Design a protein with these regions (language model features):
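Polar, enzyme-active/binding microenvironments
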Residues: 1-205
Length: 205
């Protein structure tokens, strides 16, 4: 689940859930959960990020790397940037690699979405920024405790995306494509959707 203030994923290799959110000081935080019956217990939370102003978390588990990519919006030197870390779960503990900026432009008011393509063994981040093109998809590859990215691909989206924009994405292994849902704070025509492959088009839902 990709939420505006928290994200949760299932780590299949560790048989645990991983939650990413803001800490009480607004730095990035992560904690491992173990489900037993109808209850859940937690390990010790960690904090990360060079910013004490991190919000809009999304996450996706990479089954090939057996790690999770946590994506969030961070205040870097007074400018909101798209940032991410690679998280590794071991038992009831989690560690993260060095923070990586996936956008050097302002990503304010954008809840990025991230999904894992199990066929390509890659992750894709969908996000909004103040540059041109404004809406992009970015493919990433996890290696060790870090992630590297290719060249952003511009998205042509429908609807009024001038204000807050939220993205949620999920990969369909049968179709071999990623479904992208996005919405805005001011949208009056509902949600929008699109299908991501090597190209991209979007249709109003």
């Amino acid at each position: 689940y990709n939420g505006s203030m928290a994200a949760i994923v299932y780590d299949a290799s560790a048989s645990k859930v991983l939650i990413a959110s803001s800490s009480s000081g607004a730095a990035g935080a992560a904690i491992v959960g173990t489900v037993s019956g109808t209850t859940i217990s937690f390990g010790t939370a960690i904090t990360y990020s060079t910013s004490n102003d991190s919000y809009y978390f999304s996450a996706a588990y990479d089954a090939n790397a057996q790690k999770t990519l946590i994506v969030y919006d961070a205040n870097i030197s007074g400018v909101r940037r798209g940032a991410c870390v690679v998280a590794t779960v071991s038992g009831t503990s989690v560690t993260v690699g060095t923070e990586v900026l996936y956008s050097n432009f302002n990503t304010s008011n954008s809840n990025a979405g991230v999904s894992y393509d199990s066929d390509a063994k890659k992750l894709t981040i969908f996000f909004k920024e103040t540059s041109t093109p404004q809406y992009n998809a970015l493919v990433g590859t996890i290696s060790g405790t870090s992630v590297t990215f290719g060249t952003p691909v511009a998205l042509t989206l429908n609807g009024d995306l001038s204000t807050e924009t939220g993205f949620v994405a999920a990969y369909d292994p049968t179709a071999g494509k990623t479904a992208l849902i996005y919405a805005t704070k001011t949208a009056t025509t509902g949600l929008y959707y699109g299908v991501w492959t090597t190209g991209y088009t979007a249709t109003n839902l």
